């Protein structure tokens, strides 16, 4: 029940921070993540809350993708194939092959979500080439932590219980959000 409260200081910090060109997009990503956190609190009442939470996080990741693409273009970079795409695709394939037999009617939504979050990681990976250190490290570790958080959640929910799943999900998720914000705010 604390997870939505823990994201509010981060949203506030971005809101009051010095303006930067894509601040609204970052705020939108955080607010949709916050809405996803709230919706997931009610999963025990009805499965629709899981779907709505998934949609909220999907929207947040789309905002992160847009943010990263805009930042790549701002750096006069180009979106091109890099080796990281292969690693991300392998991870995505293995995870989905493990989960799909256990997803039931959620196969399509989970595949869509997994592709979108993998795209977010790939855009973060590309953007990291145009960012100085340590900003690029925050960006990459934040995006990877988001994937880890969602992977633990999915594995725990659909495949096999993970010991201390709640703790692992919260730690990786909160670090992910903090690191992504840290990579954007100067």
Residue ranges and their predicted role:
Residues 1-186:
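Polytopic alpha-helical membrane-helix bundles and their juxtamembrane interface segments
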């Amino acid at each position: 029940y604390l997870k939505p409260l823990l994201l509010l200081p981060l949203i506030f910090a971005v809101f009051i921070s010095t303006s930067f060109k894509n601040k609204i997009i970052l705020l939108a990503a955080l607010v949709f993540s916050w809405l996803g956190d709230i919706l997931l609190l009610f999963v025990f009442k009805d499965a629709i809350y899981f779907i709505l939470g998934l949609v909220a996080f999907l929207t947040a990741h789309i905002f992160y993708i847009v943010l990263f693409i805009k930042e790549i273009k701002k750096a006069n970079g180009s979106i091109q194939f890099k080796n990281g795409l292969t690693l991300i695709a392998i991870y995505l394939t293995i995870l989905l092959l493990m989960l799909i037999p256990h997803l039931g009617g959620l196969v399509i939504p989970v595949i869509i979500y997994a592709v979108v979050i993998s795209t977010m990681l790939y855009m973060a990976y590309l953007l990291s080439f145009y960012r100085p250190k340590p900003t690029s490290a925050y960006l990459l570790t934040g995006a990877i932590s988001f994937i880890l958080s969602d992977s633990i959640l999915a594995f725990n929910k659909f495949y096999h219980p993970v010991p201390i799943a709640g703790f692992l999900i919260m730690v990786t998720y909160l670090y992910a959000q903090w690191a992504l914000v840290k990579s954007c705010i100067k």
